[in-house]
């Protein structure tokens, strides 16, 4: 959640459509982006809604010619809205086309690039390369790859150096499971790669920002334990690549994950610290404004222009400008101005969850803080406690549908954590920030001891509140999220409380919202075809029958929280809340946690594993959840129900393909990795089968002779007509 400067009591005196054109421009840019997105993912409902809005505004434009001047202002606002719907649509469309232009094919290249980012995790290392050179031609996008640390000379793998290697590249799909892969697009990562052969390293130089960040890293690593140093680095500059997974899970489970992303909370604290110091030095307001603006711009650069940091910085600078010139501080207009700047420069940020949570949280605080605070004061609750609770509740209520859409759960301990832990965290942030600045010049290790101990207290309290668990919450789609926010806005004082029938209209909107959410959470019905879909990770597919039975085949290739989240998102996107069976042909102990979590979350009835699974693993899985666990030799046919059978094809003790028999019609699904021995097996044994495979395999395996009926991109659906 976020804190913002105090809300002026005059913010809600007038109607929004009369006095806040910036808000209408911001809404127009959002609707324009969604309009473009809806056509790309074929969201017919959203298209219809936006067409209706466009039609209404067009009618208003015509009518405005014949209306009196008093009413004309309303229609001029609508005209402004439609203009920026068009602007937002054009900018988003341009960004989509720009990112979706892949100049390189998915094959092997000799690639040279500058190391931009390095993340080490036990035995593996993940590297992001920039300033890419392929065949003596420069490209302005980045490439990301992971490999074993033993494959590289770690002394040379530092930010600023360059490397040259043979790599197998694969383009990043902008849309996965109906959602934009905004985290990669924000970092301009167009390709992921697999390292084939390392060729050479080159010594390079760091930028000024990189040198500063490296200096901060060294100070933190010298004075704090490893996990706390990377946590501190994350909350100072927003770089989470080396943050330990269990530490992130702790903050997430207790409802404090928002403090790990540099946001309005952190920017606000920095502004408070520096402005306080500058005022003590008796600097005049214009000089404070200039110096603070310069510092915040530098901070945005250090944080790689994170949307939440840019938003908070723009709002802070705007408030300082208003204070400097004695102007009224209008929270909604300042908030909208920040959003306009970001969407004009980076249109795809609209689809980034960090942008959504940051702006919606602040929107909720602007709308709901005052009425909730007044309610707490009515019960004689202390001002500081009432203020903290009001901010937390306002942001939580507003972001509820976005949290539901992306995570499907809400931490029970959120309120307690934000009331008790957040003030302690805020105090520790002050100490950490000041000690890090002093550490650039002096040895202040004794101050870092305080930071270390306060972190220990935070971890202990977080562990207690995380034990409260979480509750599952309903799924929301884009339409229902928009409706939810409109209802919130309409119910507040920003819409004239004297408006006739306001309560009746609000109740009607709530009723429509409830019905829409219910429809959104209704399992899709497939009456004719069998639906086969793959997630945006390797070796994981879902099969939905015409009787709406769901079978999850495979749970990924690496295990870990990322794959679990991607699988859960895939199932939620398809409105699948119950899975009849999880089938894993190549079981490994690293899949154990994900299988257990998926089984609990999606009420899995059966888990079917390959025959070489140990009894110890079976007992472990049975202990974690209530599903029945079976083993099967997948070289023999397994009957799932009356219509569907499955069997696997094995080479070198590993299944690389499996056969689905649906109503006596056979389909063979191939794994993404096709070695030459597997290709030979296909040519000899499966050439008369109907195959479903990844499109990349078709491109790279021209020597396969088979009857290909479907080519899979990530997140594609296939209707098996039988």
Model-predicted regions and their roles:
Residues 71, 246-415, 475-525, 707:
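Hydrophobic alpha-helical transmembrane segments in multi-pass membrane proteins
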Residues 1-101, 494-501, 601, 607, ...:
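N-terminal leader/targeting segments
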Residues 299-303, 370, 374, 395-412, ...:
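Membrane-interface helix-loop junctions at the exits of transmembrane helices
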Residues 32, 113, 167, 354, ...:
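Residue-level signal for inorganic ion chemistry
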Residues 46-57, 357-358, 418-423, 477-482:
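Alpha-helical transmembrane segments of polytopic membrane proteins
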Residues 2-15, 82-258, 565-572, 578, ...:
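Membrane-interface helix/helix-cap signal primarily in integral membrane proteins
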Residues 2-3, 43-44, 109, 123, ...:
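Non-globular, low-confidence helical/coil segments that flank catalytic cores
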Residues 1-38, 322, 383, 420, ...:
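Hydrophobic alpha-helical segments
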């Amino acid at each position: 959640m976020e804190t913002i400067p105090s809300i002026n009591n005059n913010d809600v005196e007038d109607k929004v459509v009369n006095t806040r054109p910036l808000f209408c421009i911001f809404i127009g840019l959002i609707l324009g982006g969604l309009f473009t997105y809806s056509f790309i993912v074929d969201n017919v409902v959203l298209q219809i809604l936006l067409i209706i809005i466009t039609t209404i505004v067009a009618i208003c434009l015509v009518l405005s010619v014949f209306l009196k001047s008093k009413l004309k202002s309303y229609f001029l606002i609508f005209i402004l809205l439609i203009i920026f719907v068009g602007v937002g649509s054009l900018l988003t469309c341009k960004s989509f086309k720009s990112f979706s232009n892949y100049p390189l094919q998915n094959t092997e290249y000799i690639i040279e690039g500058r190391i931009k980012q390095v993340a080490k995790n036990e035995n593996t290392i993940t590297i992001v390369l920039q300033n890419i050179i392929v065949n003596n031609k420069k490209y302005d996008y980045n490439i990301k790859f992971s490999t074993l640390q033993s494959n590289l000379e770690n002394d040379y793998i530092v930010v600023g150096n360059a490397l040259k290697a043979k790599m197998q590249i694969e383009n990043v799909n902008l849309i996965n499971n109906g959602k934009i892969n905004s985290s990669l697009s924000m970092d301009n990562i167009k390709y992921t790669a697999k390292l084939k052969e390392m060729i050479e390293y080159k010594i390079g130089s760091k930028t000024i920002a990189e040198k500063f960040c490296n200096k901060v890293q060294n100070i933190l690593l010298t004075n704090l334990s490893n996990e706390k140093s990377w946590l501190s680095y994350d909350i100072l500059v927003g770089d989470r690549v080396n943050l330990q997974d269990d530490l992130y899970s702790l903050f997430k489970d207790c409802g404090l994950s928002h403090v790990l992303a540099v946001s309005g909370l952190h920017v606000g604290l920095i502004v408070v610290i520096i402005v306080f110091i500058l005022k003590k030095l008796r600097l005049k307001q214009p000089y404070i404004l200039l110096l603070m603006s310069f510092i915040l711009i530098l901070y945005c650069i250090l944080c790689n222009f994170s949307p939440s940091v840019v938003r908070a910085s723009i709002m802070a600078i705007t408030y300082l400008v208003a204070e400097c010139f004695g102007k009224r501080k209008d929270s909604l207009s300042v908030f909208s101005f920040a959003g306009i700047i970001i969407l004009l420069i980076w249109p795809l940020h609209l689809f980034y969850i960090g942008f959504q949570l940051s702006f919606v949280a602040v929107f909720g605080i602007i709308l709901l803080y005052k009425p909730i605070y007044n309610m707490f004061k009515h019960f004689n609750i202390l001002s500081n406690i009432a203020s903290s609770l009001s901010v937390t509740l306002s942001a939580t209520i507003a972001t509820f549908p976005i949290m539901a859409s992306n995570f499907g759960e809400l931490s029970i301990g959120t309120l307690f954590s934000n009331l008790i832990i957040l003030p302690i965290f805020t105090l520790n942030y002050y100490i950490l920030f000041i000690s890090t600045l002093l550490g650039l010049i002096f040895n202040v290790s004794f101050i870092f001891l305080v930071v270390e101990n306060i972190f220990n207290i935070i971890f202990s309290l977080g562990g207690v509140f995380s034990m409260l668990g979480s509750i599952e919450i309903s799924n929301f789609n884009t339409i229902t999220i928009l409706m939810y926010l409109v209802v919130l806005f309409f119910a507040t004082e920003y819409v004239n409380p004297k408006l006739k029938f306001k309560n009746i209209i609000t109740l009607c909107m709530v009723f429509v919202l409830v019905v829409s959410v219910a429809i959104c959470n209704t399992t899709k019905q497939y009456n004719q075809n069998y639906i086969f879909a793959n997630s945006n990770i390797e070796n994981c597919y879902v099969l939905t029958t015409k009787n709406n039975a769901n079978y999850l085949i495979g749970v990924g290739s690496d295990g870990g929280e990322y794959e679990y989240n991607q699988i859960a998102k895939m199932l939620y996107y398809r409105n699948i809340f119950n899975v009849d069976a999880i089938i894993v042909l190549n079981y490994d102990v690293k899949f154990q946690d994900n299988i257990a979590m998926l089984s609990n979350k999606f009420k899995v009835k059966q888990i079917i594993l390959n025959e070489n699974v140990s009894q110890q693993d079976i007992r472990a899985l049975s202990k974690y959840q209530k599903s029945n666990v079976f083993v099967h030799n997948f070289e023999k046919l397994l009957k799932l129900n009356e219509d569907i059978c499955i069997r696997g094809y094995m080479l070198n003790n590993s299944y690389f393909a499996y056969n689905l028999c649906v109503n006596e019609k056979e389909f063979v699904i191939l794994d993404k990795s096709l070695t030459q021995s597997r290709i030979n097996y296909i040519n000899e044994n499966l050439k008369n089968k109907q195959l479903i495979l990844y499109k990349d395999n078709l491109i790279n395996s021209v020597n396969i002779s088979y009857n290909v009926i479907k080519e899979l991109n990530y997140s594609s659906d296939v209707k098996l007509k039988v």
